[in-house]
Amino acid sequence: MTNESQPVSPINKLTEAKTIISFVVAVFVLYMLFSSIEFDTIVGVITQARISYILLATVIFFSTLPIRGERWRLLLKNIGVKAGLRDASEIFMLSWFANSIIPAKMGDVYRGYLARKTWGVPISKSFGTVYVERIYDVLTLVILMGVSSILVFGTNSPSEIRIAIALGFSIVVILISIIIAFSKGKMFVSNRLPIKVRQIFINFTEGLQESVKKGSISLIVFYTILIWIMETARLYLVVESLSPIHNMGISLSLIIFVALAASLLSAFPATPGGLGAVEFAIVGVFVLVGVDPGVSAGIAILDRAISYWGLMMVGGIVYVLSKKK
């Protein structure tokens, strides 16, 4: 958690050691992943993609932005912040961009900083809404991953898949446990903290508690499911852009599983935007079920051209033009 009065800039963090190291790690992972596959094969796959499908996948990806903005606006409303959809969506895009260039979801902290700058809400309190948002995302991801893995693998899921799902459920349990522990023991913990961080902790805890209001849960769940349906649709269109040429026969349930597994990795990344880890997951799962490595690599590159490099480009433009940064 950042100091409440400290300015936050994702661009300034680009030169920090942890950011540079995270990009080095990402490049190394990408090199290890793609170096074993013939470069000409990957290029051949990519150039055969139907551009209309890729463009539609791109439109769907960026169409999730106002939905994500509206979901966050509802969470902000729960803590007493009257935010407009346009402002919430713009700030979400700026934090999304920040997450693509700096590691460890620091863009979420940047979102809290922009919320304070725009609406006067403490960073730590608005960060509580981001934390709750993350729980909605991960819980939905893990449930849908579990269902899709059964459809793909039946009861004989590979150990790697079972571990991934178990890890996801563990993360959900930990996140929810923290909310319960902080809510039940707010005063007990805060009274034992240094005065400098006591109010930050109290604000964060209040943000957690107030974000979870029964009246908005059903709508937030609906938006969350809709977001992940659209994320899956993006990957489906990328796969379909190659399908007539390579006759892959990839089932919808497998596409759902891969899209969600990749999203889970990007939810808590050690590298900016999960760079390296997400590509590894996409290629790894497709190869695991018998898809050609070159085709799998092509799918990963095309999909990440939208969800990572496309986001970085569009987000960068928004960042340059935005008056909120």
Where do the PLM segments sit?
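Predominantly cytoplasmic-facing regulatory/coupling regions of multi-pass membrane proteins
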Residues: 1-93, 151, 157-267, 306-325
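Helix-loop junctions and terminal segments of transmembrane helices
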Residues: 73-76, 109-114, 280, 318
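Short intracellular "coupling" helices and adjacent cytoplasmic loop segments at the cytosolic face
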Residues: 82, 93-110, 208, 272
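Membrane-interface alpha-helices at helix entry/exit sites of multi-pass transporters
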Residues: 85-90, 107-109, 121-134, 292-302
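Membrane-embedded alpha-helical segments of transport systems
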Residues: 94, 98-102, 127-150, 301-313
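Interfacial segments of multi-pass membrane proteins
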Residues: 115-122, 280-298
